[in-house]
Amino acid sequence: MLFSSIPFLFYFLPPVLLLYFLTPDRWKNLTLLLSSLVFYGWGEPRFLLFMLAAIAQGYAFGRLMERYPRHKRLFLILSAVLSLSLLGYCKYAGFFLRTLGALTGLSLPALQIALPIGISFYTFQVLSYVVDVYRGTVPPQRDLLQLATYVAMFPQLIAGPIVRYADIAPELTRRHHTLTDAAAGARRFVVGLGKKVLIANVLYELMSAFLQSTQPSVLFTWLYAVACALQIYFDFSGYSDMAVGLGRIFGFHFPENFRYPFLSGSVTEFWRRWHISLGSWFRDYVYIPLGGSRCSRSRWLLNVFLVWGLTGLWHGAAWNFVLWGLFFAVLRAAEKLWYGHGLEKTRLLKHLYMLPLLAVSFVLFHAADLPAAGQQIAALFGFGGLPASGVESLYYLRSYAVVLVIALLGATPLPAKAVQRLRNTSAGSAVLSVAEPVALVLLLAACTAYLVDGSFNPFLYFRF
């Protein structure tokens, strides 16, 4: 079930909210957990077993570490092996068999394994909890209900952000519910829904038009690349906004996942602003334990390439994702070793540097396969014998110009700053007190109309 769907918005969420706020505080976690299990099992109930198994082993090994501290390293290894084996089988077994068959020429069976929704997210949450217990960062949770609620909580279950146990442990035990928090959460949710439905979905239509085009051109390929970058951003950040907003309504404060990444002047800065919870997870649980940057240059390079290769692989079991991660590894290493300091000289230089790199990266990320990625990236820079523009490219540029401009502005802090300036004046604050609720209602109505119409409603990170 997607947040941006009629069943969720009108059949699931309203009764869950009503039941949750009617429930006494001591039973709120149980209500939230049961609601989350219904949410997760809505489409494929059998996948509940995978998630419940992940929760059970995380809880068991956390308790075993507490009871037998001498053997906690063994328990950590066993827990990690179980978690990663389940993820590896479900998500990567088919990919590795295909790769092995291609390399060796062997006729290996083609595995068709259904991927449990959100397994990459909840696996990382369980792993981080067990590692933190091992390190002594957090005490083991003795209440299975609280740990299960942390892992299975539907606002962040299928698409993050990757919430660490320490981030919300106090709120699992006791949290405050206020009208202010609920209103702020609802506002954040509706804005995220608008980003997802009215911008990301519309941009996906432009991307689909390019992929089906019989008149490709350099201009059309650049339109596609820009649409890719903006669509993935509004798709995922919109979903993250909805998750953070829902968490706020239920009394939780989830970490932010995006901070205007397209304003970045380097790849290093970009990954401090893009999918922050994933980047910080790999930093704290893979990169630093490997030695981070406090080691020899060759070891540091190995660490960087390993972490970024895994980051790419986390996003999908395909070589374009692996190369996408390694592409950022090369850039990250080059910035640190050679030209990173030079980028700081002028703001214009930094953004001119990032523009083609982001275009290449998002085309590679979204490509159906490596040959398609190669053709599209070559077309960006005028290779392949394509014309500079064509009838189709000019038609789609005119047709989607308004959405592209709105998306480009929405990817900057300008709208938020404008609203804040209004809020800082008495007259502006009075206007916003009326205009903001009306605008949110109209935005929700527009999103609902789009969804009722049966328009295309994809979500890329749903597959992770």
Where are these regions (language model features)?
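Membrane-embedded transmembrane alpha-helical bundles that form the catalytic cores
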Residues: 1-463
